[in-house]
Amino acid sequence: MQDTNPSQPDSPITGYACIQDYLRNLSGAPGVYRMLDAQARVLYVGKARNLKARVSNYARPGHSPRIERMIRETASMMFLTTRTETEALLLEQNLIKQLKPKYNVLLRDDKSFPNILVAKDHSFAQIKKHRGAKKEKGTYFGPFASAGAVNRTLNQLQKAFLLRNCTDAVFESRTRPCLLYQIKRCSAPCVGLISDQDYAAAVKDAERFLSGRSTRVQEELAEQMMAASEAMEFERAAALRDRIRALTTVQGTQGINPRGVAEADVVALHLENGQACVQVFFIRANQNWGNRDFYPRVGEDVSAAEVMEAFLGQFYDNKEPPRQLILSDAIENADLMTEALSEKAGRKVELLVPQRGEKAELVSGALRNARESLARRMSESATQTKLLGGLAEAFDLDGPPQRIEVYDNSHIQGTNAVGGMIVAGPEGFLKNQYRKFNIRGDDLTPGDDFGMMKEVLTRRFTRLLKEDPDRDKGLWPDLLLIDGGAGQVSAVHEIMMAHGVQDIPMVGVAKGIDRDHGKEEFHRTGQRPFALKRNDPVLYFIQRLRDEAHRFAIGTHRAKRAKAVSATPLDDIPGVGAARKRALLAHFGSAKAVSRADLADLTAVEGVSAGLAQKIYDFFHES
């Protein structure tokens, strides 16, 4: 990859003239180009087999209104040459996600998806939910469309196969069965109530079920149930019946389970009125692991082929593609996309646009889902627009806010204090922009809510002024909502003045005298408190915003508290991370036992070198 930017034009020309000026020295190599406006903001990122030929297209008239606007705004360009067009495609999608150009199709929600992991770093395998890099030893099944889908499947698998989900440290410390054994969700291998061989057989059955051999597993359980019934072992027969029902429940929640599709993602696109919905169904081992809808940002005159190609490039930028992608719409550069995805996966990846048969039926079903999801979203968007207009009227704003930030704190008598910020706008809650703040102030009095809010807003505005001083990146709020009354509003106003931020409206939302929903009072600097009518839709909207901020802050606080509860002296030893901590606790059972271990015992733990063993030993034995 090489930066080959021709010298910028001397005069501040824009549009067609600017592009023609760059063409004079541009090479015919493959690569990526960027179009920038007069403020050097990236307008568009594109790839090309031949940069000179591709950019010359922009120098000729006859483009769509969207592209014409982009050309008029173009004041400069940047170029990167690559060895191959495939490399250019991968770089293009990476830059689009990073720079979020104004005129590109942009996938806005791009989280990783959870898997089920059968962890095999212990003699009794653990079954659990896993998200992120696949570094742990074991077998992975997925991806699943959501954490809820994983949790439901895990719940039923525990009923069917009685596998443990506890951590190794908890497993080693048990002296009697836990509650999961009592409710028939675990076979209690921790206290020896099942043999190694029987537990391994249960793990194997669970893996067979998740690998698509579910029918055979159920048939074997049914045979065992009949044999137990004939032997008049009715309690065992009933237990086997319940296990079969649990597996049937898993299959029932999966909807369609295609027989002729072993490993594929079904990707269906619906475009309407300048908006798009992409439905992705995840099919692995002939089983449907759920579906997710995505709403990429598109222009009013963009084609289905362009949206589909951009979606595939960005979606699989940080995910391993399956063996087949079954698409609703063909893309222009299908061969190039196939080559890029195959290179990423390290094996062949097929792109299919089926016209008949089972695969076409899958696409048809996904398209129906996409149409219905987009219709709901457009309806909700219209309602949201109306509510934002009502909010502007209620608080005397210049116009409907496009970005609302809501803040709340959570703590227990000042301990594990956190602040939470949620963001909402015309498209609803923008969860990928939520932020949490661990309260750092050592000089704060425990429970000082005013001081905590001051710290949170100080950090927020300090960062905003650093990252977006010109307010042109869409990071600044149009409205701040604070959970609290006059005192909170005064504290936040003080912070805003200190940072020179005087033009952002701020409202404190305080519960009324009886602290009841519907009796909220609203506080603004220099104004008397006021209320909205109990049946005002805007009031319900504000309550939803406040409750979401409260939920997020409490959830963050609970996670921090849980982490603090599980903290041990091992956390303070340099070189002992999460994996080595787990290994030490699994080997010794507790941090106290680790502190008593000698060097020979410590080096016997997997992943602990002689040098690290010495550090651990010295940590516990220094005077």
Curated annotation (Swiss-Prot):
Signal peptide: none
Domain UVR: 215-250
Residue span, GIY-YIG domain: 28-105
Record keywords, A-Z: Cytoplasm, DNA damage, DNA excision, DNA repair, Excision nuclease, SOS response
CDD domains to which the protein is assigned, alphabetical: GIY-YIG_UvrC_Cho
Biological process per Gene Ontology, one example term: nucleotide-excision repair
Keyword match Membrane: no
Chief site of localization: cytoplasm
Any GO CC annotation of this UniProt entry: cytoplasm
Top-level division of the source organism's lineage: Bacteria
Compartmental location: Cytoplasm
Pfam family, one: HHH_5
Gene Ontology molecular-function annotations: DNA binding; excinuclease ABC activity
Function: The UvrABC repair system catalyzes the recognition and processing of DNA lesions. UvrC both incises the 5' and 3' sides of the lesion. The N-terminal half is responsible for the 3' incision and the C-terminal half is responsible for the 5' incision.
Family classification: Belongs to the UvrC family.
Quaternary structure (record): Interacts with UvrB in an incision complex.
NCBIfam families: PRK00558.1-5, uvrC
Protein name per UniProt: UvrABC system protein C
Organism: Ruegeria pomeroyi (strain ATCC 700808 / DSM 15171 / DSS-3)
